[in-house]
Amino acid sequence: MNISSVCIQNFRKLYQCHIDFSNDTTLFVGANNSGKTSAMDALGKFLAGRPFAFNDITISNRELINQIGKQWETVACEKPNSLSEWGNLLPSLDVWLNVNPQDIHYVVGIIPTLKWRGGRLGVRLIYQPRKIEGLFTEYREAFFSARETEKAGAAEKKIRLFPNSLCEYLERYFTSSFVVKSYILDPEKFDADSPQETAFGMECLVDNPLTGIIRIDTIGAQRNLSDPEKHDG
């Protein structure tokens, strides 16, 4: 069994990045600011449980998230019951494995159908709202409370209170409002250039079914060991 490829979406500058893995060693090579570090950070955060930050959301998606917030700020807005609006905005990692029949016992939690007999298997890990209904309610309570307080103090001094937008709210409550969830992918729909839509109804029974299968170790850069421009002092 080995990792055949990964696809990183909506993570920092990596809007959609497909990476093929070799059977032995895979090296990321590229110019500065080309996304090498972002790719490695995505692997560490999704597969090793390292903490996310609001800045991990692709900048171009933040205005779209604020547009969702604008809808939520209307009094008559109905509580959402799905993540359909968020599907193309959230950081995600697709992991595609090549699994031999003798290794099936390692991946029983992500086998898509009883007809599967080996070969490609895929899992999508998404950093998503823990409960979209709860985020909706909590944001509206904070937003409307801030606006009421502003009105009450408007006669004395014009003030602007937190939160003014959904992104501003998430910057403060990101890790408490979001969590990694995993979804089984359909091997027959694999396309390196066009990732399949998330089937939110196919959530795995465990948050990370790849725990125990994939291990992430990081060796920090030892710049001073070989830097010819090293200076003392």
Where are these regions (language model features)?
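Pre-Walker A-like glycine/lysine-rich segment at the N-terminus of P-loop NTPase domains
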Residues: M1-G49, I57-G69, N81
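Non-catalytic alpha-helical coupling and interface elements of nucleotide-dependent molecular machines
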Residues: G44-F52, R130, N224
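Glycine-rich phosphate-binding loops of NTPases
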Residues: T58, R62-L90, W96-G233
